[in-house]
Structure formats: structure tokens, C-alpha cells
Amino acid sequence: MIPDMSRFQSTGSPQAVAVKNKVLKNTYMLLSASMIPTVLGAWVGINTGFSLFAGSPLISMLIFLGVAFGFFYAIEKTKNSPVGVYLLLGFTFFMGLMLSRLLGFALGMQNGAQLIGLAAAGTGGIFFGMSVLSTTIKKDLAPMGKFLFIGMILLIVASIANIFLQMPALMLTISLLAVAIFSAFLLYDLQRIVNGGETNYVTATLAVYLSIYNIFSNLLFLLMAFFGGDRE
């Protein structure tokens, strides 16, 4: 579960329609481009057997969070230059590597490819739905950000706790809540872009990407838990 602090910056005053449309267009273009290194990273991870969590799960998670927040910091500092774009694409490659273990486990199931397809379709459906809602909901969702942030922190704490507890029911609950919370985050971030609250497309892309990533990975986990076939 990967948080992004940039989404909690002040939305500022409304921007001109032309500027908002440009940010939205550039965000969608960069978001589409970011899927290429993600897929590449996942492919490399699956074919090399990459697994950051092969050792101590707690230490591995702390290393992962350290690397992720390092990327966040670097992207934020360079978001107004081409370096920020390259760092974002590098981050999405890293996230693809991290996703490879889950994908590899899914592909080991008889219906794994179908489950991955369903998770991708479900994520696409949620993204489309939130995109439509972001342009039709008139109410400002900015106050919702604080509650979503608290929910995200609780999810991270629960995930770390479950490393020791190893409770399947808690894992399922965390994934269900993650899908709901990051779907809400997606709506929140998209509305900020549409309303001109976010004027940097690199920052906007990072926020939207993280929501999509978390929705997909948790949807896939749930599908595997409830509908996964026998291991091949």
C-alpha cells in the first residue's frame, strides 16, 4: 500500500480552463506512458524471480517504503523539469518489479491469466467511473482528503501488524478497504485536476498512478482468494 503526500497540498485558486485541460491531457498521456515501464518491470521480475520479500517481511517492507519515499521526494523536487518525468517512469518500473511476485503467484494458478484480466478490467471500470464522477459531482471533495489520509495510514499500520499476525481474514479486510479507499482517492485526485487544484501533471500522474496500482493489486488479491484455481 503506497501513500503519496503530494495530494494533500493546498488546491489554491481555480485555474483557467485552458490550463486545466492541458494538465488533464498531459496527466492522461503520462499515465498511459507509465504503464509501459510497469509492464516491463513486472516482466523482468517474473522472469528473474525477483522478490524483495524473500527475507524478513518487515525489513523488506521498510526497505520498500524507504525506496518509494525516496522516489516521492526526488519526483517532487524535479517535477517542473524533464528529470521529474524520467524519475516517475523509473518509479513505475520499480513498482512493476514489486508487482511481479503477486502476478507470478497468480500465473501459477490454472485460471491465473483470467484473474489478472478481470482485475485489469475491474480497475479500468473503476477508473472510468471515477473519471465520469469527477466531472459531474459539483460538491468540492477537498475536505475528504484528511479522512482518506487517515484511512490510508490505518491500512499501512494494519498491513505491518498482519506481517506478525498472519490472519487471512485481516488480509482480506485490508484489501477490501484498500479498494474502497483508493477508489475514493482516485475520485478525489481527478476532481482536483479537473477543478484546477493540481497544476503540475507529474504530481497529478503520480497520485493517480498510485491509486490505480493499489486498486489493481488488491482486486487481484481478492480475486485470487475467492476464485483462484488450483496451482499448476
Predicted region positions:
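A hydrophobic alpha-helical transmembrane-helix feature that marks the membrane cores
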Residues: 1-232
